[in-house]
């Protein structure tokens, strides 16, 4: 299993906060752009891992983050501790388990010796059958 964390840093939060004070519509666009940037960064990093582990005959499983499905947000703190995130990249978690800076990601990526596709996605893989957000697949 690979644990990883990434952040755009405090500058992204500061810029969004500053813009929201005078032009909310532009702040919303900046918020979306920053979210896309951190996801693109993680995707690129995952592709690099795919190449590196592929040389060893290993295949990556999909990236999965605390807060997805039944993977509790309470896992954020152990992630950050294990990866020494505060010291290395300035990433912390609030008392309400939200990452700070806000444009940040923690996730796990599984490794397998078999190249199998995931046939289940989203709500299909989650065991929370009574979830108010559950969608039929």
How would you label these PLM feature ranges?
Residues 16, 135-137:
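Short conserved micro-motifs at the rims of enzyme active sites and ligand-binding pockets
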Residues 56-135:
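Short terminal or interdomain "cap/linker" segment that borders an active site or interface and mediates
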